[in-house]
Amino acid sequence: MTTEPAPPAPPGVSRRHVLRGLGAATGVAAVAATGLLSYRAYDAAVLDPGGGDAHAPWRDWRAVPGPLGAVGAAVLAASPHNTQPWRFAVADDAIDVLADPTRGTGSVDPFSRERDVGLGCALENLVLACPPRGLSPTVTLLPGGDPVARVALTPGPAVTHPLYDVIDRRHTDRGPFRATPLAPATLEALSGADPAVHWVVDTAARAALGRLLVDAAEALVADTEQSVDNFAWFRATHDDEERHRDGLVLDGQGFGPLQLGAAKLLPPSSRAEGDRFWVDRTRDVHVATAAAYGVVTTPADTDDRAAHLEAGRLLQRVHLRATSLGIALHPMNQITERLDREATTGTASDLGPRLAALLPAGTRPLLVFRVGVPVRPARPTPRRPVAAVVA
């Protein structure tokens, strides 16, 4: 849920020069001059963002009845780097949620905390999607192994929770936000007044957290192993999206139409270019336009899978509430990714103490996100179909 890819650039040309100096429209014109624009536009799906089979799960899930329909909602949940680290064992009377050990991010998530948060997000969507199908869900967390959770199903009245109606409108928004402050009552509504969500709104605290996020991004890309593990989930082309149906894609980066078109038409970028662009984007767009930050915390003495699963369920609810209110949300986990990396390498920096100074005493940070009023709607990103995730 952290690193975003860079818009590609021609060999020897900086993407910052292409998309900022020349402008996106100029970038498109430059490619058009080669005589290949029509084919490249078709091949890169420039004219049909969000189309193709990789996006079909967003369109098809509501019409599917029973437990498989609920799984169809689950696969639309948020996950780290869009890894979709889930599998499901489906029966008429229960759905088991399982972790897929092949879909991790390595050194970026060495303790699998982010993976478990993603599983919690899927679990929340699954639970929301059962009642409209006449199924009453009862959740039992099984944090000691696999499955990680079981949802028992019994017949019940067909009722719809308001959050169910926005499941297919919820998308991570990495674009700019408007300079519109969010009222305290709005933030409380987003979190459901859950004390596990700590809001960072004060100007000084928000600036301090913004600097932390930029510093953590710089540290992450300077760590070769983390940089490589991040970039492994970048799907550089439309063909990559259709083949993998997961990962970080250009449609999910919050670009305007012309900028997105230019990015898709230009050749794929290198890892080093992508790293540099992400740091720049973090500083110049994400931090610069955040109206507020939320930090999902656990008690300082609690760091287990059950807590991570519940945090994922909470994050999914916050994001769905935000969607229902026209508010954008963007997870930014580079600080905790660096803290976990330091724990595995035996190193230390000032990131931990600086973040702790912004949080209530006795809490442990699990994930950070920014919120704000979006400049433009976020686009859907690829999803694997239900058939690919049912064990």
Predicted features, each with a name:
Residues T2-A391:
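Acidic, surface-exposed loops and disordered segments
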